């Protein structure tokens, strides 16, 4: 059973900041960040503005945080 880290956690580690610092920068509560990082909450179902604020705080794109492999959409 491999440990699956959320893209949010990987992006935060890459940015070199704590959950608290990400919370301060983004205005998203630490508890929410923790739940998203531990995959207790699905970031794909988060409000767009929350994902946007997290991405801005981490200096990355929203696509970097969303789990796009889980989203299936038809090309057409």
Q: Predicted regions span which residues?
A:
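A short, Lys/Arg-rich alpha-helix, primarily the initiator
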Residues: 1-14
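Conserved hydrophobic/aromatic packing and binding residues within compact polymer-binding modules
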Residues: 8, 22-23, 33-36, 65
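The alpha-helix within a helix-turn-helix
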Residues: 12, 23, 55
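Short, basic-rich loop-to-helix N-cap that marks the start of a DNA-contacting helix
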Residues: 16, 40-56
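Short coil turns linking two alpha-helices in DNA-binding domains
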Residues: 18, 29-32, 47, 61
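Recognition helix of helix-turn-helix/homeodomain-like DNA-binding domains
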Residues: 27-44
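Short, charged recognition helix plus adjacent turn
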Residues: 44, 56, 64-76
